[in-house]
UniProtKB/Swiss-Prot annotation:
Gene name in the database record: foxe4
DNA-binding region coordinates: 48-142
Keyword hit for Transcription: yes
One MF annotation (Gene Ontology) recorded for this entry: DNA binding
Annotated protein name in UniProt: Forkhead box protein E4
Organism: Xenopus laevis (African clawed frog)
InterPro entries reported in the protein's UniProt record: Fork_head_dom, FOX_domain-containing, TF_fork_head_CS_1, TF_fork_head_CS_2, WH-like_DNA-bd_sf, WH_DNA-bd_sf
GO CC terms: nucleus
């Protein structure tokens, strides 16, 4: 059996027998008793402010006159206000950068062309102004998540060219940042998005008239209709159905007379007069080839764009084809109206029946 002296030597070799030695190690006595030998992983450093990095960034932006700062300006404010961060700047500066990019409450604003310098500006999202309890930077209510990425006009990181120009939101009246958003110029920079080539602004009086959009469906259709060679209507096989004796006449011609295609219900005897009226109006030798359509199709009404009087068709079924269609049109126009028996009536509307084609005419497809 070991003597008491030998036990005391073993205990001293471990270095954790007396409370005095515990105090010499840097930990108080009550800490060792309360934790039961469990040490704190990251002890609190002396002199470190009790604010999180998000609170430090928000504090720096709030104390800025323009409510926006560059990354260097945020570093400067933190080091001037808290002497603790004047040492070991590399560690906490990395944490500041990570918090700026990973938290939705901070918004990046590109630098304006007339203000040379390095780095973009950072500001606080107006919807995140109340994320601290009672204006105190010590406690945050919850993690802020942005619902609208176009908070500021200059923030065009994920926006598209087809979206309307965003406008800045008003700041909250009862907030610690009462003037956030007042020092920003609502300007879209062309260098941030290649498709943004113009800037559209409107005054408060023009807000009720609707906002002009750079790219809209109407403007794209109008530009496409101007590229067409003729402003006339399209005479397609949807509106004229031919039987087997007439042959395969599926090519459509551009006809200058628009009045003869504005009716939706026609009679078999009126088809001949319609063809006679359009015999002198053939003004284009460009043909469009169409795929085979269903056997029963109603006569489509004429459709016009809102801002243009030209008649336009669907762009997905247009395909340029060489060769004039005057010969086929002359053969069609030379027939009387009684021989065209493909017109049928259904619910007071006319539709054309596409019959089988004669042999030997497949080369015109």
């Amino acid at each position: 059996m070991d003597s008491p002296d030998s036990v005391r030597v073993k205990c001293e070799s471990k270095g954790s027998c007396s409370p005095e030695e515990g105090l010499n190690n840097g930990l108080p006595e009550e800490h060792n008793q309360a934790s039961g030998g469990r040490r704190r992983k990251r002890p609190v450093q002396r002199g470190k402010p009790p604010y999180s990095y998000i609170a430090l960034i928000a504090m720096a932006i709030a104390n800025s006159p323009e409510r926006k700062l560059t990354l260097g300006g945020i570093y400067k404010f933190i080091m001037e206000r808290f002497p603790f961060y004047r040492e070991n700047s590399k560690k906490w500066q990395n944490s500041i950068r990570h918090n700026l990019t990973l938290n939705d409450c901070f918004v990046k604003i590109p630098r304006e062309p007339g203000h040379p310098g390095k780095g973009n500006y950072w500001t606080l999202d107006p919807a995140a102004e109340d994320m601290f309890d009672n204006g105190s930077f010590l406690r945050r209510r919850k993690r802020f998540k942005r619902t609208d990425i176009t908070t500021y006009p200059g923030y065009m990181q994920n926006s598209s060219a087809f979206t309307p120009t965003p406008t800045g939101r008003a700041s909250y009246p009862n907030s610690i940042y009462s003037s956030v958003g007042s020092g920003y110029n609502p300007q879209i920079h062309q260098t941030h998005h290649p498709a943004v080539v113009h800037q559209y602004y409107q005054s408060p009086g023009e807000a009720g008239q609707g906002q002009h959009r750079m790219f809209s469906i109407d403007s794209l259709i109008n530009q496409q209709s101007l590229m067409q060679p003729s402003p006339g209507a399209e005479l397609t096989h949807h509106s004229l159905g031919l039987n087997g004796n007439l042959g395969n006449m599926t090519n459509s011609c551009s006809v200058g007379d628009l009045s003869c295609f504005q009716t939706q219900s026609i009679s078999p005897t009126g088809v001949g007069s319609l063809l006679n009226r359009s015999s002198n109006a053939v003004s284009s030798n460009l043909t469009y080839s169409y795929s085979s359509s269903p056997p029963h199709l109603p006569v489509p009404p004429a459709s016009y764009s809102p801002n243009n009087s030209q008649l336009y068709g669907s762009t997905s079924r247009l395909a340029m084809r060489s060769g004039p269609c005057v010969d086929h049109t002359d053969q069609l126009l030379s027939l009387p109206g009684t021989q065209i028996n493909g017109v049928c009536q259904y619910n007071n509307s006319s539709y054309m029946r596409q019959t089988h084609f004669a042999s030997g005419l497949e080369r015109y497809m």
